[in-house]
Structures are given as structure tokens and as C-alpha cells.
UniProtKB/Swiss-Prot annotation:
InterPro entries: Homeodomain-like_sf, Myb_dom, Myb_TF_plants, SANT/Myb
Basic and acidic residues bias (residue ranges): 133-144
A molecular function (GO) term: DNA binding
Protein name: Transcription factor MYB72
Chain's role: Involved in metal ions homeostasis, including iron ions (Fe) acquisition, via the regulation of NAS4 and NAS2 genes expression. Necessary for plant survival in alkaline soil where iron availability is greatly restricted. Involved in the up-regulation of several biosynthesis genes of secondary metabolites involved in iron uptake under conditions of iron deficiency. Triggers tolerance to nickel (Ni) and zinc (Zn) ions. Required in the roots during early signaling steps of rhizobacteria-mediated (e.g. P.fluorescens WCS417r) and beneficial fungi-mediated (e.g.
Lineage of the organism: Eukaryota, Viridiplantae, Streptophyta, Embryophyta, Tracheophyta
One GO term (biological process): stress response to zinc ion
Region spans: Disordered: 118-144
Quaternary assembly: Interacts with EIL3.
Length: 296
């Protein structure tokens, strides 16, 4: 048989369940006469078929004369809350600070009323602490945001000053850049593969692009005009000889002056008009017979 406390009674021979009024009176009478020095032997001495533990609990919790009946006062509840925070669930020690209250009553009132009453307050306290923490976090966040705004404002001011400085430098170098860009555009046009297809009015003016060709063309036209003038003069002189002018006549001063003006003129269209006007003003004789040497 293992070691341990010996049972106080034979459980097969004891009575269980609620106490009767007769049993309560027997216990009260015995304790008032003899006291309760030994709860283990008290049931046999009092003639009760109960366990010693059951007799002790019945006396302490219900039958002793100083036991308080009724509800706990506000002062007693506050004392229970205070001692429970320091001692925990040690109900017998808590009962020693509350005269007339048993440990069982204190435990019952704690589990039934006080514990439920403290739960909302504790939750509210936890909520308040959480709210305080969130408020503090928001405050810190706002402070950080204000500091960031200050730093960003300083950075923007510095950036604006730097950009204005660069803009001033660009304004000083703008004419030079304009000239460089113009030269680059001209070089691009010269290097472009489709340069011949450009339909610019400037490029379509051949006199501007090729001034030497224009001068050469005018010179050739002027030479051809001179040759034509000579041929017409010869043919007119041969076909319609003038009176009093022998064959192989020499040019008159008026005709020489006109021819010299025609040679020196740079307007071919006016040369023809002046020449034909000169021919029309001459007097020819169709029936004039050449006498003498025939001009070949």
C-alpha cells in the first residue's frame, strides 16, 4: 500500500447528500459542549454517520454562530478584489481577512459576480491602452509627415534655384545654339538621300542655284541673235537691193549704230522688234534691175 494520508472514515458506512436539521442540531450541541479539536474522530464521538471533512465544512460554512448571512457589502467586494490581485485563488487566506465570511462563499461570489464585473473594465482598460498606443503612433506619424514636408519644401526650393541658374546659362548660350542648329540643318539637307526631291521654292529657282548657267545661256542667246541679224541683213541686201547703193554696199551709219546697239543689248525680245521695225521702214523696188556686178 502506498504512502499517504489515511482515510478519515469508511466511505461505505457514511452518509452522503444534504444535511438534515436533526444532524445539524446534533453537530451544534456536540461542538458547544466539547469543541472541535479533532475533526477525524468527531463523527464517532457525536454519533453521526458523516465524514469528518463533511462535519468541518458544515460547521464552518453554515452552523457556526459568527457566520454572516446575506449579500456581500461593497467594502467586502473591494477587499476580495484587492486580495485576489495579490494572493490569487487562495480563498482560505482571503477569508481570514474577512471575519464571518467563509472561503467557499468568497470563491462563489468571485466566480459568480466579481469576475464578470471586472472583465468589461479590464477589456476597457486594454482598449484604452490600445487607443493610447494608436494615438501615439498617429502622433509620431504626423510628426514624421511634417518633417518630410519640410524637407521636401527645402529640396523643391533648392531644385528651383538650380533650375533657374541653368536656365540663365541656357539663355546666354541660346544664340550660339541657334547658329549651330542652322548649320546642322543645312548639313542634314546636303547629306540627305532625297535631296533632289525637295520642292522648296528656294531650290526650284535655277538662277539662284546655278547663276553661271543662266549667264552662259544669256550669252549664247545673245550670240545666236547676232548671227541671225547678220543672215537676215545679207538676205535682205541680196534679194532687195536698195537704189543708188551698189552691190556689196557698206552699212550706213544708222544701220551700223542699230546693229551695235543690238549686239550690246541684253534683251533678245526687243532685238527682234527693233530689227523688224528697221526693215519695214526701208523702201524697196521690186522692178529694180541691178546693173553691173551681180552679188553672189
Amino acid at each position: 500500500m502506498g504512502k499517504g494520508r489515511a482515510p478519515c472514515c469508511d466511505k461505505n458506512k457514511v452518509k452522503r447528500g444534504p444535511w438534515s436539521p436533526q444532524e445539524d442540531l446534533t453537530l451544534i450541541t456536540f461542538i458547544q459542549k466539547h469543541g472541535h479539536q479533532n475533526w477525524r474522530s468527531l463523527p464517532k464521538l457525536a454519533g453521526l454517520l458523516r465524514c469528518g471533512k463533511s462535519c468541518r465544512l458544515r460547521w464552518i460554512n453554515y452552523l457556526r454562530p459568527d457566520v454572516k448571512r446575506g449579500n456581500f457589502s461593497k467594502k467586502e467586494e473591494d477587499a476580495i478584489i484587492h486580495y485576489h490581485q495579490t494572493l490569487g485563488n487562495k480563498w482560505s487566506k482571503i477569508a481570514s481577512f474577512l471575519p464571518g465570511r467563509t472561503d467557499n462563499e468568497i470563491k462563489n461570489v468571485w466566480n459568480t459576480h466579481l469576475k464578470k464585473r471586472l472583465t468589461p473594465s479590464s477589456s476597457s482598460s486594454s482598449l484604452s491602452s490600445t487607443h493610447d498606443q494608436s494615438t501615439k503612433a498617429d502622433h509620431d506619424k504626423n510628426c514624421d509627415g511634417a518633417q518630410e514636408e519640410i524637407h521636401s519644401g527645402l529640396n523643391e526650393s533648392q531644385n528651383s534655384a538650380t533650375s533657374s541658374h541653368h536656365q540663365g546659362e541656357c539663355m546666354h548660350t541660346k544664340p550660339e545654339l541657334h547658329e549651330v542648329n542652322g548649320l546642322n540643318e543645312i548639313q542634314f539637307l546636303l547629306d540627305h538621300d532625297d535631296f533632289d526631291d525637295i520642292t522648296s521654292e528656294f531650290l526650284q529657282d535655277n538662277d539662284i542655284l546655278f547663276p553661271l548657267d543662266s549667264l552662259l545661256h544669256n550669252h549664247q542667246t545673245h550670240i545666236s541673235t547676232q548671227e541671225m541679224t547678220r543672215e537676215v541683213t545679207k538676205s535682205q541686201s541680196f534679194d532687195h537691193p536698195q537704189p543708188d547703193i551698189p552691190c556689196g554696199f557698206e552699212d550706213t551709219n544708222e544701220e551700223s549704230d542699230l546693229r551695235r546697239q543690238l549686239v550690246e543689248s541684253t534683251t533678245p525680245n526687243n532685238e527682234y522688234d527693233e530689227w523688224f521695225n528697221f526693215i519695214d521702214n526701208q523702201t524697196y523696188f521690186d522692178d529694180f534691175n541691178f546693173v553691173g556686178e551681180v552679188c553672189l
